[in-house]
């Protein structure tokens, strides 16, 4: 990964609550695991509107949602938050007609971002004032927030990038389809919704490590929690063995690797 490349997340939780709070925490753990040391955590598309994306009254977030979620991100070492979509607008017509009933650069029609804090007509949403206030508070304390680090317990969460590279597989291979289904099930599954959540509810703070790369984590006397599947690269298994041999403790949740 190039040192000039800065990765960022898309965060759309539609309300941070008990049911999904572990998702936000693990997003940052996994991003931290693959980022270079000089790359702070960032969210380039951070949900900040009303969540009524089809303008039918189908969503309405609490006025405090963007503020609260942003504070939790910053507390977990996130250093850049791009409120998205902050200002609505209009999608231009395509020069070459598509004859699809829309003929615009986006599928949303002419008006875009009608759920944003500032809608296409410039009208302010009920979410605007709270976002403005929280942003000003953050900027006023920027020098302190930029230097702070989350205090963590001696617990790590392992991340295997290959487990998530399942967007495409050869459609004619039943074997590959079964493999993708297996990885999709065990790479997150109940491990996110039970074990990771229980760690957080019991006040454990933890970071993420990339198991496909050597790192200082292999020398730590820590507890490493890993959502595992039948499939696991030999290099990953060897690193885990070295971690345990060096005094670390390994907790596998899911399946014991067999290939």
Residue ranges and their predicted role:
Residues 2-22, 48-49, 225:
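Aromatic- and acid-rich polysaccharide-binding/catalytic face
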Residues 25, 33-55, 59-259:
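Carbohydrate-binding surfaces of carbohydrate-active enzymes
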Residues 5-9, 27-29, 33:
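Extended hydrophobic/aromatic segments used for targeting, binding, or gating
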């Amino acid at each position: 990964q190039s040192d000039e490349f800065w990765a960022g997340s898309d965060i759309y939780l539609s309300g941070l609550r008990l049911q999904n709070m572990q998702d936000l925490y693990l997003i940052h753990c996994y991003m931290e695991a693959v980022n270079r040391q000089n790359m702070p955590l960032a969210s380039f598309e951070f949900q900040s509107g009303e969540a009524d994306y089809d303008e039918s009254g189908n969503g309405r977030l609490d006025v405090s949602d963007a503020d609260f979620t942003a504070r939790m991100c910053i507390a977990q070492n996130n250093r850049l938050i791009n409120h998205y979509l902050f200002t609505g607008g209009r999608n231009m017509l395509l020069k070459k007609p598509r004859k699809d009933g829309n003929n615009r650069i986006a599928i949303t029609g002419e008006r875009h971002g009608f759920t944003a804090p500032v809608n296409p007509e410039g009208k302010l949403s009920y979410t605007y004032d709270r976002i403005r206030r929280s942003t000003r508070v953050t900027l006023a304390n920027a020098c302190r927030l930029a230097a702070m680090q989350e205090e963590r317990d001696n617990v790590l969460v392992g991340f295997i990038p290959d487990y998530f590279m399942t967007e495409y597989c050869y459609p004619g291979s039943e074997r590959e389809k079964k493999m993708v289904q297996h990885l999709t099930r065990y790479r997150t599954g109940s491990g996110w919704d039970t074990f990771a959540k229980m760690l957080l509810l019991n006040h454990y703070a933890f970071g993420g490590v990339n198991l496909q790369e050597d790192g200082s984590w292999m020398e730590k006397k820590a507890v490493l929690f890993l959502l595992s599947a039948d499939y696991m690269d030999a290099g990953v298994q060897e690193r885990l063995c070295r971690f345990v041999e060096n005094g670390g403790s390994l907790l596998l949740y899911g399946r014991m690797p067999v290939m």
